[in-house]
Amino acid sequence: MVVSTFTDMDTFPNNFPPGGDSGLTGSQSEFQKMLIDERLRCEHHKANYQTLKAEHTRLQNEHVKLQNELKHLFNEKQTQQEKLQLLLEELRGELVEKTKDLEEMKLQILTPQKLELLRAQIQQELETPMRERFRNLDEEVEKYRAVYNKLRYEHTFLKSEFEHQKEEYARILDEGKIKYESEIARLEEDKEELRNQLLNVDLTKDSKRVEQLAREKVYLCQKLKGLEAEVAELKAEKENSEAQVENAQRIQVRQLAEMQATVRSLEAEKQSANLRAERLEKELQSSSEQNTFLINKLHKAEREINTLSSKVKELKHSNKLEITDIKLETARAKSELERERNKIQSELDGLQSDNEILKAAVEHHKVLLVEKDRELIRKVQAAKEEGYQKLVVLQDEKLELENRLADLEKMKVEHDVWRQSEKDQYEEKLRASQMAEEITRKELQSVRLKLQQQIVTIENAEKEKNENSDLKQQISSLQIQVTSLAQSENDLLNSNQMLKEMVERLKQECRNFRSQAEKAQLEAEKTLEEKQIQWLEEKHKLHERITDREEKYNQAKEKLQRAAIAQKKRKSLHENKLKRLQEKVEVLEAKKEELETENQVLNRQNVPFEDYTRLQKRLKDIQRRHNEFRSLILVPNMPPTASINPVSFQSSAMVPSMELPFPPHMQEEQHQRELSLLRKRLEELETTQRKQLEELGSSGE
């Protein structure tokens, strides 16, 4: 609602003369007031008229829109009825097509002979790749076996060489030892003889004998050095031979580790083959499930076709009955129906054209059904071929595993023979090498490790036997699954009959849906009329509510604007006050510092009592002002009268007098604390003001 009011009185000109009596002036003012009121009423009525006119035009437009919507709904109803009729005709055509497709599907059902041929083909296709793979694995195993035997032979050869060299070095050392011991004994005998001679011979002879002995000593020292060099060379050769033996042992250990790694890889391949076999079993199960699903679909389609064929027969029978009735009526009343003959002929032509269209549609649907059936047959054949291929693969794996078992048994026999031969060799070596007991102990430990490894290999062979038995059990379970597939085919034939019954039920549901659709249309028309009436009533109510809400909104908006302006003014005043107070605080702090310096100076000098009392009063006055200022800042919500309380003045005056004996640094700390409290208080005020402004802004929006 728009209401304009006059605020300027200058718009009404004053036509009366300036002079006159007081009665004339009073009547003139009353007349002007009446004129102003009349003009205000006119403008008010004008604004109301314009609003009513706008509402009238809007309502007319809405009325036109509703009429158009009604026409549109009526047209949609007609189109839906036409669509339902077309759907009926299409369903009849599909019924005929499905009957033909059913007959074709019956012809294309797999016989047991065809199934056996497919199984044989799948077995052949699955067996060939698996046989090749197991053959390759056997070749690799033989290759690794040959390498292992070669390494074992080299190891034994190197070991025998090492023992032979060790025995030679021991013999050489023993011979050298015996030789040196005999020489030392001979030298000691010579020494004793010389000593005896020295005791018996004169001094002249002694000098000659000493020289001769010195020469012999030099010769013997040289000979000793030569022997030591030979011993060092022998030691070096011994160390080199030991290093070579250690290198050979390391190489053999490395080769053994590689062989163990190859054995582990072969075991891993075996496990992967087992996993593949399990996966193939799962795939066989999934293919059988798909086969059952497809057969269920086939049975459903057959049931639908049967139901549709029964419907077609009923329709044909009804059509025949109608034609016979028409013929009887035409025979009885030819004179009466001569006028209507042309109409009936035209209707017959239309029916014939419709029949031709339906026939064309039926042929098209037949072609589509044939294609779908072919695709289904292909899928079923592909699934069966995959199942047979998996069976063949499993049989190949079984054969390969049996061959591998035989090889492992042969290896076990060879290992037993080799172990016995090694035991004999070690017993001979133990008898021959009693001098090197520590070395033989180490070798015995290595032999024990090898024996443990052989025992482990035997256990692995037994495990493989158990796995082969498990595979045989799996093959038997797969054969059982094949028999279950044959049973599932019989179940599918039974499910076809169930599908036919489902089609009949669906027909009945279609009829029910049609009747429900007609009822829903009638109810929709009634509800439309009722909703239109309700809509018009609600429209008037909404217009009234909108006007009330707009007025309330304008009032609230004005209030918010005023509150925001007042808040801004308060904030600016508060900030100015804070600035002034901060300046005062700084001035007071400066004065306080000056007074403290003066106090210190006076304390140093002998100040008279009058000056001291005067300064003390001045300090009390400054401290009182400072406390008042602090109470104003720290407690801003207190009324101004409370801050000018004489009791507070007395207490504030008393406190500084009590605090005078404290040192200045304590007063500075207290002052800094008060300033920090002030800052915190100011920050809290700012945050509260911001929150209030945000709340006002959100409510205004």
Swiss-Prot record:
List GO molecular-function terms, semicolon-separated.
Answer: identical protein binding
Q: Which GO terms describe its cellular component?
A: centriole; centrosome; ciliary transition fiber; cytosol; Golgi apparatus
**What is the annotated localization of this protein?**
Cytoplasm, Cytoskeleton, Microtubule organizing center, Centrosome, Centriole
UniProt keyword annotations, A-Z: Ciliopathy, Cilium biogenesis/degradation, Coiled coil, Cytoplasm, Cytoskeleton, Disease variant, Nephronophthisis, Phosphoprotein
- Main location class: cytoplasm
**What residue ranges carry the coiled-coil annotation?**
40-634, 665-698
**Residue positions where Phosphoserine is found in the record:** S698
- Outline the segment boundaries, as ranges, of region: Disordered: 1-23
Q: What disease involvement is noted? A: Nephronophthisis 18: An autosomal recessive disorder characterized by chronic tubulointerstitial nephritis resulting in end-stage renal disease in early childhood. Extrarenal manifestations, including intellectual disability or liver changes, may occur in some patients.
- Subunit composition and interactions: Interacts with CEP164 and IFT20.
Q: Which PANTHER family match?
A: CENTROSOMAL PROTEIN OF 83 KDA (PTHR23170:SF2), NY-REN-58 ANTIGEN (PTHR23170)
Provide the protein name.
Centrosomal protein of 83 kDa
Organism, as annotated: Homo sapiens
